[in-house]
């Protein structure tokens, strides 16, 4: 009888130089290394401004999934290497730029509230600043409307205690003084206020309305005030 030949060892039984078994299929390493990017403070202000304009232009007109880093680089007229150096990936570019835009809004709002004591006047000023932002930054409003609610935490300003407290202090003070509705928790009153602004802002931009929102400010504030103030005050 001819001698039987033993079968060669399968790939799963072979060993590599380290003595570990080899696999016929390489397993993908699912571990990810956090991106290390350069501080944004090191980027030239003029370059950052160009990136901001590009982000607002591109993301306002298209779905975020359709935008690429190459498009952002070309529109901003900066190198792709620069984008990766300071941001690392597309999502970080978007969230960082939106944080800068909203950060300026926060600073302006807090500046305008200085020295105003009346609850109604403080609420009026807060609404005016927000609506003025919608009128002057329609592209930013569109970009924000496309950010998933689950991703809002990626925009740092949404966790900015100074900004949130600036909003809440106006409403909390109003409740304590017996001016604003106190039959619901403070956060519900805050949601009513933000929902009013958000809906107005998004629809104003979608409709491409020619007249700015603040052209009807008195009427809009009256609606908001009646919804948030105690009935006996709103009817005065």
What do the predicted segments below correspond to?
Residues 96, 110-136, 190-193:
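Hydrophobic alpha-helical connector segments
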Residues 68, 141-145, 153, 179-183, ...:
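Short, hydrophobic secondary-structure boundary micro-motifs
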Residues 44, 48, 69, 91, ...:
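Short, structured helix-loop boundary elements
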Residues 133-153, 202-203:
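Amphipathic alpha-helical segments used for helix-helix packing
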Residues 44-55, 72, 97-105, 167:
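Generic hydrophobic, amphipathic alpha-helix propensity
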């Amino acid at each position: 009888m001819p001698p039987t030949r033993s079968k060669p060892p399968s790939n799963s039984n072979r060993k590599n130089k380290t003595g570990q078994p080899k696999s016929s299929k390489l397993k993908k390493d699912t571990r990810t290394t956090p991106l290390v990017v350069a501080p944004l403070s090191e980027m030239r202000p003029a370059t950052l401004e160009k990136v901001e304009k590009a982000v607002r232009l591109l993301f306002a007109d298209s779905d975020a999934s359709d935008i690429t880093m190459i498009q952002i680089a070309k529109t901003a007229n900066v190198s792709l290497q620069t984008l990766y150096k300071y941001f690392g990936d597309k999502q970080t570019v978007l969230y960082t730029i939106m944080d800068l835009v909203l950060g300026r809004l926060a600073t302006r709002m807090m500046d305008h509230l200085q020295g105003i004591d009346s609850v109604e006047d403080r609420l009026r000023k807060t609404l005016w600043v927000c609506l003025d932002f919608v009128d002057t930054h329609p592209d930013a409003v569109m970009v924000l409307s496309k950010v998933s609610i689950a991703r809002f935490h990626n925009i740092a300003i949404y966790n900015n205690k100074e900004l949130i407290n600036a909003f809440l202090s106006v409403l909390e003070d109003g409740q304590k003084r017996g001016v604003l509705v106190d039959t619901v928790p403070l956060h519900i009153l805050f949601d009513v206020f933000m929902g009013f602004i958000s809906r107005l802002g998004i629809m104003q931009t979608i409709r491409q309305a020619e007249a700015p929102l603040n052209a009807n400010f008195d009427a809009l504030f009256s609606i908001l005030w009646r919804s948030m103030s105690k009935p006996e005050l709103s009817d005065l």
